[in-house]
């Protein structure tokens, strides 16, 4: 589990194709400082398992990206030199400064517009119609690993759903969201509670009427 509070921006230093998967090597001196083999590190919102670390204090780690993660996220489009958001898995005694983030991406969204304010920026993204019911005004959403509050959403009947988030200066400078231009895509993870409610509602009329169920 993660909190969506990015610890550092890392850099892709190597990409090695492995059949239908990828092996990424990422530079992140902070997140690798106390990491060990098998630890979880979210890379721009995708939970990956660290399998190797650079020797001699290089501050790099290597992780495999499976075919499904490539299909569902932006990781397959990364190039050497690209910046990524990094966060270590939360501990039991961690402060939950953002919200519960699993690192399980639901899909991607395209940046439609970026409207600057005095010291902030409002970003509007497209949204897969299947995900639209899972986002609510003032609810939580994770974009490329960053925990954010939804500041506006399109009407329920909109043919092309969208949503907005407002970024403070700290988020603009400390994460890759400040580097985005219209047309760029981000990884989207909706709130876990919203996903569970939607799933239960889908089974509302199929639930057995008895007191228990047998498999």
Where are these regions (language model features)?
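Conserved loop->alpha-helix
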Residues: 1-215
């Amino acid at each position: 589990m993660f909190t969506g509070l990015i610890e550092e921006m890392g850099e892709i230093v190597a990409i090695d194709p492995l059949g239908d998967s990828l092996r990424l090597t990422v530079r992140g001196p902070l997140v690798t400082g106390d990491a060990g083999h098998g630890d979880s590190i979210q890379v721009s919102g995708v939970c990956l398992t660290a399998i190797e670390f650079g020797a001699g204090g290089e501050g790099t780690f290597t992780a495999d990206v499976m075919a499904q993660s490539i299909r569902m996220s932006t990781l397959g489009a990364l190039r050497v030199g690209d910046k990524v958001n990094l966060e270590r898995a939360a501990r039991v005694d961690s402060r939950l400064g953002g919200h519960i983030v699993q690192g399980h991406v639901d899909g991607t969204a395209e940046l439609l517009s970026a409207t600057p304010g005095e010291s902030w920026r409002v970003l509007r993204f497209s949204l897969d119609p299947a995900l639209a019911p899972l986002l609510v005004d003032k609810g939580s959403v994770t974009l490329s690993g960053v925990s954010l509050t939804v500041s506006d959403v399109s009407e329920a009947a909109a043919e092309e759903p969208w949503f907005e988030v407002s970024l403070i200066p700290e988020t603009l400078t400390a994460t890759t969201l400040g580097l985005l231009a219209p047309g760029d895509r981000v990884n989207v993870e909706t709130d876990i509670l919203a996903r569970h409610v939607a799933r239960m509602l889908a089974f509302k009329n199929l639930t057995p009427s008895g007191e228990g169920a047998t498999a």
